[in-house]
Regions:
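Conserved Walker A/P-loop ATP-binding site and its immediately adjacent core
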Residues: 38, 42-80, 104, 166-168, ...
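Interdomain hinge/linker at the junction between the two RecA-like core domains of SF2 helicases
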Residues: 163-210
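The feature captures the C-terminal accessory region of ATP-dependent helicases
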Residues: 49, 353-625
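Conserved SF2 helicase motif VI
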Residues: 299-328
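SF2 helicase catalytic motif II
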Residues: 103-106, 114-158
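A short beta-strand element within the Helicase C-terminal
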Residues: 283-297
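Inter-Walker segment of RecA-like/P-loop motor cores
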Residues: 71-114, 254-261
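Conserved strand-helix element at the start of the C-terminal RecA-like helicase core
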Residues: 52-66, 100-102, 204-234
Length: 625
């Protein structure tokens, strides 16, 4: 897809830039309009352009907000009836019709238009706003792609966003779309404080303490469960309001929250918490300058991840009031933990998609060839299973936005594998000046959580071993760390933690392997520790003394090898040293005496004998009184 540029001056709006390039201040057709900046008036421009328009918005709140400001607009969503749309379309008093609809509401427009729908597609401009949401949301909101077929049938249409994603749908190429990129002629970068932590709740608490003097704190967290936990643990209920979907409002009311709403409600509270429904498109107009906190807690929900290239830019762009210093907010902070997530490379995603495509085409061919209704039904069910993976649309054609979603999902996951990866992503957007901070404890709350709630005991052991290894490393670099305190924290994570701690001291190489390359079962750890204890006892002062006392009289003399074996076995038994058992390393044989004394074989006579020469030097100190 070719790219053209339109240049935006300081204090200019999109309409000004378009007029400079095209001689008129309206959005051209067949473009993916990359605004670069939020709040430069793309929707405003379309609403005030002298033509009929259908503007598809991702969520209801933005539609409500725009319609409150523009009296001639019609909002179409769940509560809007077909008859209301018909009445609006037939209202001759409104010269230029401006319909703002959710993707799910679009079918009501089609139904209301009836036989006139083809005329609407020829005479109305169709604008798909915040177009990246098609890719980002189709995995859990399949209906968002419902208007796509209709969109491409409009004579004039455009995609628009400040943060559009790459698209693979072939119709963009077939219809000669171009990417129209807005290039600001001024420095527009925003300052962002990125905090990487392994103690999420503690860090959030610290930041809210820092912001206690702020007139308004706006928190963006895409998890109802996470919001519930945050408000309760930090006692924010009396000073907060939560903005989420209607379903989220119901869930929060069941948890005792009466301060949850589904649309912007002024005045805002001291603490305002928004789910992803409010990350884009919505205008938030304030008379006080807010502080913004973006929160990601991977231990709670992976969908709290925020894409630096899209969602982070959109979030800071919600605030439209410019204050005397030219800024719309005081501070922007993103707090996140990290995880070693399983991430597919683009090549692996391609291979997966290829296999889906092969299966899809084979099933589709068999479906069209089948003459038996039962076979057709079975094949259709199999096709629907692929559809459930959002790779087929409701017409059972390949869903290109679903495919784009797969790549996009893995791309964002890749950032959250380390703090440095997230930092690099933010810097690569060229939108943010990043102040990077790692706020970690030797053992953080998140480390404890991940150990306690590991999916299996083997993973729990691996995570605990890694935490112990990291604690050793940090203590070697900072002598002020209270190591025993953190050891006790880790002990409380796992009832067999002491076994692992013992292994770390006794078998450091084996322990390091478990920490770095994969866990072991508890039985394997018990065996390793038992062997270690055995080895320690075998060469303890008490055992050496007993062995020396028995064999002292045989020094410089011969003794049957089998007798040596029996004597050592009895001493091991006396000291509870496990030996000659399944899965136990310690074995007692005719050669074992050679681990304590210098011996010489005397095999010329039967039975075979040893000549005991002297106690090995390393044990001499142990037999001194």
């Amino acid at each position: 897809m070719n790219t053209e540029y339109v240049y935006l001056g300081q204090n200019e709006y999109l309409g000004d830039a378009l007029k400079s390039k095209y001689g008129k201040d309206c959005i051209p057709s067949s473009v993916i309009l990359d605004k670069t900046l939020t709040g430069i008036g793309a929707t405003f421009t379309e609403i005030h352009t002298k033509r009929n328009s259908i503007i598809i918005e991702p969520n209801v709140p933005v539609i409500v907000g725009k319609c409150q400001k523009e009296s001639n607009c019609l909002g179409v969503y769940s509560e809007t009836t077909v008859s209301e749309i018909k009445k609006y379309l037939n209202n001759d008093a409104i010269k230029y019709k401006k319909i703002l609809t959710t993707p799910e509401g679009f079918k009501k427009i089609r139904k209301a238009a009836g036989n006139s729908y083809n005329q609407i597609q020829q005479t109305y401009f169709c604008l798909f706003d915040e177009c990246e949401k098609l890719t980002q949301d189709c995995d859990y909101r399949a209906a968002i792609t419902q208007p796509v077929y209709d969109f491409f049938e409009f004579k004039e249409k455009a995609f628009v966003s400040a943060t559009p994603l790459n698209v693979s749908h072939p119709e963009f190429e077939n219809q000669d779309f171009i990417r129209l990129k807005v290039e600001p002629l001024f420095d527009y970068r925003k300052n962002l404080h990125l905090i990487i932590t392994n103690s999420y709740e503690r860090t959030v608490r610290e930041e809210l303490e820092r912001l206690k003097g702020s007139p308004c704190v706006c928190i963006f967290l895409n998890s109802i469960t996470g919001i519930n936990a945050l408000v309760n643990s930090l006692n924010l209920k009396e000073e907060s309001r939560i903005y989420c979907s209607e379903d989220g409002v119901k869930k929060l009311k069941e948890c005792g929250f009466d301060n949850a709403v589904s649309s912007i409600n002024y005045p805002l509270a001291k603490y305002n918490i928004f789910t992803s429904r409010f990350y884009s498109a919505v205008d938030i107009d304030l008379n006080v300058k807010p502080d913004i906190l973006i929160l990601t807690n991977l231990n709670q929900a992976h969908h709290t991840m925020v894409d630096p290239y899209t969602e982070a830019i959109q979030i800071q762009g919600r605030f439209r009031t410019k204050f005397e210093d030219g800024h719309t907010y005081n501070s922007l902070t993103h707090i996140t933990n990290t995880q070693d997530l399983e991430v597919l490379s683009d090549e692996e995603v391609t291979q997966m998609i290829d296999e889906y495509t092969i299966t899809y085409r084979e099933l589709l061919q068999r479906y069209h060839s089948a003459t038996d209704e039962a076979r057709k039904k079975g094949l259709k069910q199999q096709l629907k299973r692929i559809c459930e993976d959002y790779l087929l649309d409701e017409r059972m054609n390949i869903d290109y936005f679903g495919i784009d979603n797969k790549y996009n999902e893995e791309r964002v996951k890749r950032y959250y594998s380390s703090g440095e990866s997230i930092r690099q992503a933010y810097e690569a957007t060229e939108f943010f000046n990043v102040e990077y901070e790692e706020r970690r404890q030797a053992v953080g709350e998140d480390d404890i959580f991940r150990i306690k709630y590991a999916p299996s005991e083997k993973v729990r052991i691996q995570r605990l071993a890694f935490a112990l290894q990291q604690l050793d490393l940090q203590c070697s670099q900072n002598e002020n760390i209270n190591k025993s305190f953190f050891i006790d924290l880790l002990r409380n994570c796992y009832e067999y933690a002491d076994l692992l701690i013992e292994m770390k001291e006794a078998v450091p190489i084996g322990f390091a392997h478990i920490a770095s390359f994969g866990g072991a079962s508890r039985k394997e750890i018990e065996k390793i520790v038992a062997d270690s204890r055995n080895e320690k006892r075998r060469f303890s002062k008490e055992v050496i003394q007993d062995i020396y006392n028995v064999f002292q009289k045989h020094i410089s003399q011969k003794i049957a090898k089998e007798e040596c074996k029996e004597i050592v076995g009895e001493i091991y038994k006396k000291h509870n040293i496990l030996h000659n058992q399944k899965d136990i390393k310690a074995k007692v044989s005719q050669q074992t005496i050679g681990e304590y004394f210098k011996v010489a074989p005397q095999n010329s006579e039967k039975p075979n004998k040893w000549r005991i020469e002297y106690l090995l030097p390393q044990f001499e100190e142990l037999i001194k009184e």
